[in-house]
Amino acid sequence: MDVHYDADPALIHDKQVAVIGYGSQGHAHALNLHDSGVDVAVGLRPGSSSRPKAEQQGLTVMDIGEAAAWGDVVMLLIPDQHQKDVYEAKIAEHMTPGTALGFGHGFNIHYDRIEPPEAVDVFMVAPKSPGHLVRRTYTDGSGVPCLAAVDQDPSGGAMALAISYADAIGGTHAGVIETTFKDETETDLFGEQAVLCGGSQALIQAGFETLVDAGYPEELAYFECLHELKLIVDLYYEGGLEYMNHSVSDTAEYGGYTRGPRVIDDAVREQMQEILEEVQSGEFADEWIEEYEQGAPQLQEERAALTEHPIEQVGQTLRGMMPWLNGDETSADEDAPDAADTAPASSS
């Protein structure tokens, strides 16, 4: 894969950039672009709670349609499930030859929910971190790795523009990796479902329930199966699998090697393959959009059930004993009817 550490800053500086949305990724992109000297405006719906925040931070704020008409580059950074409706109602009519449409995640392009005119460049810049870290590393003089992809390139310069955009938000300090909309979308969704959100949550709950059902205190089960997971994930994050195993006790390392494969066995791998196939075929995308269009009843049901799970009850009590957990820096995308953040941020 090609990795870029340099860009032509003039490409994005010669454009007017409309960032649609001011949530986790939107605020970071807009502020970083602004501080890099790019002519940027934020497009928000009327009544958005993000309007005063963006204005207080020195940004120009417009209605979404106004911003789309003003921008040479329109960067769509609202949740996946809202993008199609917003694009068709407010943005599509302004996508004229010579303009460019950007995304922070490939969902709506890859699954053909948004189909821009052929004369419009379509690109993606996807930082591989939450928005608050995109912003913090930029202000520290560095950046986070970004993925860049192109779906349409009538100008012949869409990838160069994407890399220039990534440079303006700090991405070239860490590296901008060329990919495709297909690969970014499918790996992102699979990772969320099988490992990061779905798989890890199911594993945590199963471990907690196994200990509690065997008669162990809920508090100990919480510490061993949820709280201490951060210690291990931080080691993965810092140095990979080998570094984690080098950092734990020999007892823990041996137990992990010999028992871990019994948890993630061939049956689990078969389920992972099935999940991947559902992502690749578009089955999951269709299922999720249908769920959303029906008012998300299953999502609401799952949220309510999780709130009542014993691991949440005991966790709330134990976290109250940990005052250092109060400084949460994360922010969800707010410029939408709900606050879901599906622009990994993948999430994700």
Curated annotation (Swiss-Prot):
One of its GO terms (biological process) is isoleucine biosynthetic process. Residues 180-325 form the KARI C-terminal knotted domain. One of its GO terms (molecular function) is magnesium ion binding. Residues 323-348 are annotated as: Disordered. Substrate binds at S249. Involved in the biosynthesis of branched-chain amino acids (BCAA). Catalyzes an alkyl-migration followed by a ketol-acid reduction of (S)-2-acetolactate (S2AL) to yield (R)-2,3-dihydroxy-isovalerate. In the isomerase reaction, S2AL is rearranged via a Mg-dependent methyl migration to produce 3-hydroxy-3-methyl-2-ketobutyrate (HMKB). In the reductase reaction, this 2-ketoacid undergoes a metal-dependent reduction by NADPH to yield (R)-2,3-dihydroxy-isovalerate. NADP(+) binds at Y22, G23, S24, Q25, R45, S48, S50, D80, Q81, H82, Q83, G131. Residues 1-179 form the KARI N-terminal Rossmann domain. Residues 339-348 have a biased composition (Low complexity). This is Ketol-acid reductoisomerase (NADP(+)). Belongs to the ketol-acid reductoisomerase family. The keyword Transferase does not apply. It holds the Pfam family KARI_N. Binds 2 magnesium ions per subunit. One of its GO terms (cellular component) is cytosol. The keyword Magnesium applies. It catalyses: (2R)-2,3-dihydroxy-3-methylbutanoate + NADP(+) = (2S)-2-acetolactate + NADPH + H(+); (2R,3R)-2,3-dihydroxy-3-methylpentanoate + NADP(+) = (S)-2-ethyl-2-hydroxy-3-oxobutanoate + NADPH + H(+). The active site is at H105. Mg(2+) 1 binds at D188, E192. Pathway: Amino-acid biosynthesis; L-isoleucine biosynthesis; L-isoleucine from 2-oxobutanoate: step 2/4; Amino-acid biosynthesis; L-valine biosynthesis; L-valine from pyruvate: step 2/4. The lineage of its organism: Bacteria, Pseudomonadati, Rhodothermota, Rhodothermia, Rhodothermales. Its EC number is 1.1.1.86. Keywords: Amino-acid biosynthesis, Branched-chain amino acid biosynthesis, Magnesium, Metal-binding, NADP, Oxidoreductase. PANTHER family: KETOL-ACID REDUCTOISOMERASE, MITOCHONDRIAL. Its cofactor is Mg(2+).
